[in-house]
Design a protein with these regions (language model features):
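Short amphipathic alpha-helical interface segments
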Residues: 1, 29-49, 100-119, 163-182
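Short helix-coil junctions and helix-kink-helix linkers
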Residues: 1, 51-64, 123-133, 184-193
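Single conserved hydrophobic/aromatic residue that forms the stacking wall/gate
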Residues: 2-9, 13
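C-terminal tails and terminal domains of large nucleic-acid-associated
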Residues: 177-222
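Short amphipathic alpha-helical interaction segments
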Residues: 7-8, 61-70, 130-142, 192-201
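Charged low-complexity interaction tracts in eukaryotic proteins
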Residues: 11-33, 72-101, 141-168, 212-222
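Short, hydrophobic beta-strand segments
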Residues: 18-20, 49-58, 87-94, 121-122, ...
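C-terminal structural cap/anchor segments
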Residues: 106-145
Length: 222
């Protein structure tokens, strides 16, 4: 999980800072600042760049634990900040227009009302005026990148609070059992197969769980 990765990164923080030459650290920061500044300019409504993308662009094939420790170090020094599964420059803020803020409020109200059993995005967009659609799609991307919504599939988003509740139930299950089936997960969430499968496939894609035949086990990102 993100929390466990953060803990692991903090464990090596002092060692990382100690053996990394200040000139090398400054060089990494300069590159990081440049990458994120360009990303923010190109994507002003996104909360930040995905951690995996930043790690790959900044460190190429370097050891992942070391890369995460350096990023954690930059965050501790107030140079960058963690936003959901992304990083942003510390002083970056998403700025929405008055119209976009109104769309944001409406979108959040819609998703709050739906809970887990959400409509497809196409059906959500139908609830907006045609001339609002372009802005609406940008605002939804902003809500996903900022962590307020979690995009399970290209058509299904859920509120962050719903996702966190599901994640707690998932962790509790694996604290007591070694594997998980789709039927067990569906019953655990009290929902239909469609939504249970969407969450499981999101877990698979993000290596939180690993599918093995008809069951799933904790993955490397659990």
């Amino acid at each position: 999980s993100t929390l466990m990765r953060s803990s692991a990164a903090s464990d090596v923080y002092k060692r990382q800072k100690r053996y990394m030459a200040s000139s090398e650290f400054d060089k990494v920061w300069t590159s990081c600042e440049s990458l994120l500044a360009k990303y923010h300019k190109d994507n002003p409504l996104h909360g930040g760049m995905k951690v995996a993308e930043l790690r790959q662009k900044l460190f190429k094939g370097a050891d992942r634990a070391r890369a995460d420790a350096i990023l954690s170090c930059l965050a501790r020094e107030g140079k960058i900040k963690s936003v959901a599964d992304r990083y942003a420059l510390a002083d970056f803020e998403v700025r929405l227009t008055k119209k976009q803020n109104a769309l944001k409020t409406k979108l959040l109200q819609i998703y709050h009302k739906m809970g887990l059993e959400v409509e497809n995005l196409d059906d959500v967009y139908v609830q907006f005026e045609r001339n609002e659609l372009a802005d609406c799609k940008q605002v939804l991307e902003s809500l996903v990148s900022g962590g307020e919504l979690v995009m399970l599939t290209p058509q299904l988003c859920i509120e962050r609070r719903i996702y966190e509740d599901i994640w707690e139930k998932t962790k509790q299950h694996f604290a007591e059992h070694g594997e998980l089936t789709l039927a067990e997960f569906r019953d655990m969430l009290g929902t239909s197969r469609k939504y249970a499968l969407a969450v499981l496939e999101y877990y698979d894609k993000n290596k939180i769980l690993k599918k093995d035949g008809d069951v799933r086990h904790p993955g490397p990102e659990f």
